Each structure stands twice: as structure tokens, then as C-alpha cells.
Amino acid sequence: MIKDDVVTGRVVRVSGPIVYAEGLSACSVYDVVDVGEASLIGEIIRLDESKAVVQVYEDDTGMRVGEKVTSLRRPLSVRLGPGLIGTIYDGIQRPLERLFQEDGAFLRPGARSQPLDGSVRWDFRPHCNERGEALCAGIPIAPGSVLGTVQETPSVVHTIMVPPDIRGSVLSSFKGAGAYTIDEEIGRTDLGEPLFLSQYWPVRRARPFSKKLAVCEPLVTGQRAIDVFFPLSKGGTAAIPGGFGTGKTMTQHAVAKWCDADIIVYIGCGERGNEMTDVLSEFPKLIDPRTGRSLMERTILIANTSNMPVSAREVSLYSGITLAEYYRDMGMHVAIMADSTSRWAEALRELSGRMEEMPAEEGFPAYLPTRLAEFYERAGRVETCVAREGSVSIIGAVSPLGGDFSEPVTQHTKRFIRCFWALDRELAHARHYPAIGWIDSYSEYAQEVSAWWSKYDPRAGALRAAALDLLRKEQRLQQIVRLVGPDALPGEDRLVLMVCEMIKGGFLQQNAFDPTDVFSCPEKQVQILRTIVDFHERAVVLLRAGISLSALSQLSCRELIVRMKTTYGNEDVHKMQKVYDTMCTEFDQLSVCAAARTQGGEKVE
């Protein structure tokens, strides 16, 4: 039944979070519906001649056949505007903190609360052109045009933009500077469309932009294993697969804390509630090194924990990426942490089974790759509709059962990402953090960001290649060592083992609880790696000149090199040159000694 643009039907079948309704044939796929007496939020995901299949995003326990279903004739959308930063939402953008104050610790079915606080008045400042003239009525506008700014947090200036789907090309009225709520009209177009500080956007539709740009700048995370060996660019995509207890969540937390993105969107999708609690308790205490302010002043949290309705997991990733695209359109660099896409895929599998669809690999639906592509392809570095530059970077955790990387979610994810941080169980059990294995991991962005790294050291790319080559060689040598022991190896091979221990202990391994080692600036990372690689190159020369490996292993500079990461902070990078000079001095002394002994036919022990 259609009445005042609202379509009403009735429930004819309930299968967990999937509800079948009749009388909704006039609706469209992905229309939002209110289901049952409690008005639960749902979404039409399939239509046929007589029935609509509705995915309910809330707990529908107790729902009966015959209850009313009302279509709102609009897609599921999120509200975008000032007030998003520092808020924790569920997958359908309900503010959990406000709902907790109203209903307690457990969500009441049908609970509603506005995603943005309509009582807050924001100090709005109109946009000024190049001549310093403020925006006023009669000025041409276009989708994405800047209307003005508000100070959302002390470290984030929120740009108020014309919605991408606005009708009209001229600003017919405009209020100008003042304090407004998100519900107050600040202007109107020539076709009568009102303009507000906020706007709505469908979560399943990517926000438009002018063009995609090539990636060229890394997302600096402060984690040496990531930044140097397996870098992620701004606008790139990465996956962190790993078995239980290998550190996926902790690695994502570290990246969220210390990366140089302007905005962080952290999506807890189907994981434990304690992990989101850790974020809420830790982030406000941490200081952003770039702004000196709390990290929560640049963070948006979306929590769909394992005990929340499974169907809401499916939409939480789309809600998060839509929020990220909104800030990208302001010209910001946004990083999304999705933890975990495996739980999201499991939600797809459960919903697919409820709808009696034909399963594919391991019970996952055949459209799993399509859904993964829809999510990851919304990342990128772009030029916005008004010639601003912004980016969305996606880091998705994958939780394969038993750590098996051949399972469908991991394999399909690898098709759509260019950076793969494979977590190694043996490293994790050895307390090596971050436990990113250097054999299985890779990054296709290394060449594209090499020019950026060369400003810190022209040899940066060569240093990375040399270190990775040593680690791969060490991996092969370890197989021989397990059989015959290290003493059976030639001197140069034993030197490789010794230097790789320096790389692993002095460069790759980081202490997340050490304030000096928790974050390394690019200069510090390059300086440590340069010192270790040059140590190996000079040691090889001396080894061939007759110096024994035991003499090289007794050099005092070895211990100094391994301790550089904790001895020198980011503000003391220039002091690290002392260690390099000490190393050169000790090698020079050995060279002189080797030359003298060589003339006498002796070997330096």
C-alpha cells in the first residue's frame, strides 16, 4: 500500500536477521524500511514479484508474522557534518555513548538517536576567495563547492561543502558568519534547495571526484618494518592477515595511533568488545606528535562487536568508508582501519545461508569478491570536484582460520590490495613485534614512494633491497643450520646470520611500550638501516682480507648499533652519526691491522 510516498507491507516469514515481506513491490532495492512494532531498521536487499527480502540491522527476537513493514523510499544513508570526530557509532551510525546514557549498556531494539548533536551551535565562517571577499548571495556554486568552515576540534578544521547531489548552480541566499546548529538553514540555491552545515549520503554509493591521481607519498606509520620494507602509500590498500594471537589488532592500533593521516576511521567489525574499549581508554591519553593534541580529536570509531547483530557488520564497512570519503573531499588524508574483514565476510556467509543462496568456496557467497572489490576500490588518492587533493587509505585485517592464507577471504583480498603484511606466528610467539614476516609480505608501492625516501638518503632504495636480500638469504641458510649447525658454514654466510640478527633486533623489532622506540621518524629509520647495511659491506671486505669472524663479532659498535633505536629519540637523530663514526673508526683500525698482518702472512683473530 502506497500512502504519502510511504509503502506499507507485512511480514510473512522470519529467518533470523532476514525477514520476508509482501506488499513492497513498489519499492526499490536498498530502500530503508521500519520493520515490526519496534520499528527496527532494515534494508531491502532483494525483490521479486510478490515478496521483498529485508535485512534487519537490529535484534529481531520475538518478531511475528503479520507485523507491519514500512518503506521510507530512500537508501540507507549516514549524516555528514561537524561533530563526527571523537564519536563512537554502531554500523548504522547510531551514537553508542548517547544510547548508553538513555538505555544503559545493552541496545534496546528500535532505539533511535540522532548521529550528530543538534543542540550544538557551531561558529561558521564563510569561505573567502583569492581577493579576500566572503561568499555571498549570487555567487555560482557547484557540487563540492566550499561554503565555509567550522572548528570541529582544536586540531581539525571542518569544511562545509555543497552536497554532490544538490540541484541549482547559484547561491540565491546566504546567511553569512554566525553560530548555527546542523539543522539551521544557512543558504539556498536558485532552485530552492536548502543548504545546511550537514548533509546525507548513501553508504553504498561512492562519493564523486574529478579524477584519481597516482600515489607517490607513503603513509608514515613510525613502524620501521612497514615504512621501509613494506610501505603503504597515501591512498593505498593493505591487508594484515594472521592467525589468532599474532598481533593484527595491536598492529592496527599502532598504525592508527602514529600514522600521519589527518583523520582516522577505526571500524571494529565483529571483533571483541574489549578491543574497542582499549581504543577508547588509550587514544584520549595519547598525544598526536604533529598537533600536540589528543588522538581522539582526529578519530571516528565504528563498533560492531561480536555480540551485536550480525547483519549490521555487513553495512559497517560501507558506513566507515563513506565517512572517510567525506573528509577526503575536504582535502584531507584519511586512514581506515577495518578489523576484521573476515568477520564481515562471515556475516555475508550467514546472511547468504539464511536466504538459501548457492554457496561457493567454504560456504562463502559467490559474490564475496565483488563485495570486497566494492570496499577496497573506494580507496585512492584523488582530485576532488573543486580541485582539492585528498586520499583514503584502507588497512584491513584478515583472520584466516588456523592462519591458513589459502582460504577464500585472504586470497580474494590479495586481488584488490597492493600491500600485504603477513603476520608470522613464530615471530609473534618469540615476542617479536610487529610480527610482520619478511618472506611472505610484499608491497607494490615501494618503487612509487622511493623518490620520497631519497630526500632522506639517496641510497634508501638500495639499502632496503640489500637488507631484504640479506634476510631472504638468512632464511635459506637457517635450513642448513638446522641440519649441520652454523660452524659448518663459510665465514661470509655466518656473517650474514650475524648481521641479520642485528637487522631483526636493532631495526625490525619495536617496543610498543618504550616511548623512544614506539615511533620512529623517517630520518631515524634510514640512519639505522644505513648503519647496519654499511656494517655488513665493510665486514665482508675485512673478512676477505683475513679478519676472522670472531674479531668482527667482538666490535663494540655492534651493541651500539642494536641499541640505537632506544638510545636516540626522534629529536636526537643527528647524534646517531656518532655511532656510525665509531663503527667506521673500528673498521679502519681493523683494516690497518689486517694490512699489517697480511704482510706477515698472519690471520687476525
UniProtKB/Swiss-Prot annotation:
It is an enzyme of class 7 (translocase). Coiled coil: none annotated. One of its GO terms (cellular component) is proton-transporting ATP synthase complex. NCBIfam families: PRK04192.1. The keyword Cell membrane does not apply. Produces ATP from ADP in the presence of a proton gradient across the membrane. The V-type alpha chain is a catalytic subunit. ATP binds at G242, G243, F244, G245, T246, G247, K248, T249. It catalyses: ATP + H2O + 4 H(+)(in) = ADP + phosphate + 5 H(+)(out). One of its GO terms (biological process) is proton motive force-driven plasma membrane ATP synthesis. It comes from the Bacteria. Keywords: ATP synthesis, ATP-binding, Hydrogen ion transport, Ion transport, Nucleotide-binding, Translocase, Transport. PANTHER family: H(+)-TRANSPORTING TWO-SECTOR ATPASE, V-TYPE PROTON ATPASE CATALYTIC SUBUNIT A. Its EC number is 7.1.2.2. It comes from Treponema pallidum (strain Nichols). This is V-type ATP synthase alpha chain 2. InterPro entries: ATP-synt_VA_C, ATP-synth_a_Xtn, ATP_synth_asu-like_sf, ATPase_F1/V1/A1_a/bsu_N, ATPase_F1/V1/A1_a/bsu_N_sf, ATPase_F1/V1/A1_a/bsu_nucl-bd, ATPase_F1/V1_b/a_C, P-loop_NTPase. Pfam families: ATP-synt_ab (PF00006), ATP-synt_ab_N (PF02874), ATP-synt_ab_Xtn (PF16886), ATP-synt_VA_C (PF22919). GO terms for molecular function: ATP binding; proton-transporting ATP synthase activity, rotational mechanism; proton-transporting ATPase activity, rotational mechanism. Belongs to the ATPase alpha/beta chains family.
